[in-house]
Amino acid sequence: MAERQEEQRGSPPLRAEGKADAEVKLILYHWTHSFSSQKVRLVIAEKALKCEEHDVSLPLSEHNEPWFMRLNSTGEVPVLIHGENIICEATQIIDYLEQTFLDERTPRLMPDKESMYYPRVQHYRELLDSLPMDAYTHGCILHPELTVDSMIPAYATTRIRSQIGNTESELKKLAEENPDLQEAYIAKQKRLKSKLLDHDNVKYLKKILDELEKVLDQVETELQRRNEETPEEGQQPWLCGESFTLADVSLAVTLHRLKFLGFARRNWGNGKRPNLETYYERVLKRKTFNKVLGHVNNILISAVLPTAFRVAKKRAPKVLGTTLVVGLLAGVGYFAFMLFRKRLGSMILAFRPRPNYF
């Protein structure tokens, strides 16, 4: 399996042979708080595809473990496996799903190229996906004064700086212990260090936040056009038309992350960009969105408790079964929570929301 994965990495995905695409199992490695993972999971839900999902816990540094680095040499989630195909980047995964599952029962999220809607959807998808969400994420942690009503615990701000050095030393140690992955670990260490220099620069952060406002102005205008061209008795439109598309996936997940970071009031609160505010409220009520991302902004539910269960499961002897696991949770829960607090900085550093990052 490892040899096959090494061969596939860096090459265009190959079609699985021997079975129809719909019959081959989809396997997704992701992390709940990874921005890129959230987009992929929402696409899977919108297309109603069956998929076996595996959490790669960033608080427990599972994305840095050798088995995962051999699966994806960048050590980033999400990663999709479909038969012989291994796809390691969110945009490529989404395009692969859209191009592979073409039966009539599977909803299409991208219009045909001949459609008048195609250029519009493609434009907004590319525009929204170009936003430096990783910089927003790191920046709001390092400089919380730029945010209002952030949903990230306050202690993360002080923890993150001490975790930066720990993450670098961890990658260095792993590089020494795994000679075959040394190049990959060193490359990841350099990428992390380089990005943090920019993301700790207040002037740079203010610049990209101003640029974000210009993008959201464009989205607000587009939503206003949809409202004006829709009859009163007509179906309420989405960003590019009547259908929920990949542009809506990008916009919905982007707004949800901005809310989490504490940038909602700045960008659509108090009557500012009312179309955007109405759109976000509508997205929150969408069944597929609520299923995938409904509780993701609640760190206790989406990260702390799952981490506690993961720690308890790893430490509980299997011979004693579930009863012991449940009993251990009372004591291990506190331990896991403290572990989570200690490593939350690393987790947030790994929220790579642009196509090449968490």
Swiss-Prot record:
Q: Where is this cross-link: Glycyl lysine isopeptide (Lys-Gly) (interchain with G-Cter in ubiquitin)?
A: 50, 172-173, 188, 190, 203, 206-207, 214
Clinical disorder: Charcot-Marie-Tooth disease, demyelinating, type 4A: A recessive demyelinating form of Charcot-Marie-Tooth disease, a disorder of the peripheral nervous system, characterized by progressive weakness and atrophy, initially of the peroneal muscles and later of the distal muscles of the arms. Charcot-Marie-Tooth disease is classified in two main groups on the basis of electrophysiologic properties and histopathology: primary peripheral demyelinating neuropathies (designated CMT1 when they are dominantly inherited) and primary peripheral axonal neuropathies (CMT2). Charcot-Marie-Tooth disease, axonal, with vocal cord paresis, autosomal recessive: A form of Charcot-Marie-Tooth disease characterized by the association of axonal neuropathy with vocal cord paresis. Charcot-Marie-Tooth disease is a disorder of the peripheral nervous system, characterized by progressive weakness and atrophy, initially of the peroneal muscles and later of the distal muscles of the arms.
- For whether the record's keyword set contains Magnesium, the answer is no
> Residue ranges of the GST N-terminal domain?
24-105
The places in or outside the cell where this protein is found are: Mitochondrion outer membrane; Cytoplasm
Q: Give the species.
A: Homo sapiens (Human)
Q: In which tissues is it expressed?
A: Highly expressed in whole brain and spinal cord. Predominant expression in central tissues of the nervous system not only in neurons but also in Schwann cells.
> Which protein are we looking at?
Ganglioside-induced differentiation-associated protein 1
What is known about what this protein does?
Regulates the mitochondrial network by promoting mitochondrial fission.
Outcome, altering residue 39 to N: Found in a patient with hereditary motor neuropathy; uncertain significance
GO biological-process terms attached to the record: cellular response to vitamin D; mitochondrial fission; mitochondrial fusion; protein targeting to mitochondrion; response to retinoic acid
PTM per UniProt? Ubiquitinated by PRKN during mitophagy, leading to its degradation and enhancement of mitophagy. Deubiquitinated by USP30.
Cite the PROSITE patterns for this sequence: GST_CTER, GST_NTER
Q: How does it assemble?
A: Homodimer.
Report the family membership: Belongs to the GST superfamily.
Changing residue 120 to W has the effect of: In CMT2K; dominant form; no effect on mitochondrial localization
Report the transmembrane regions from the record. 292-312, 320-340
Q: Which residues form the GST C-terminal domain?
A: 153-309
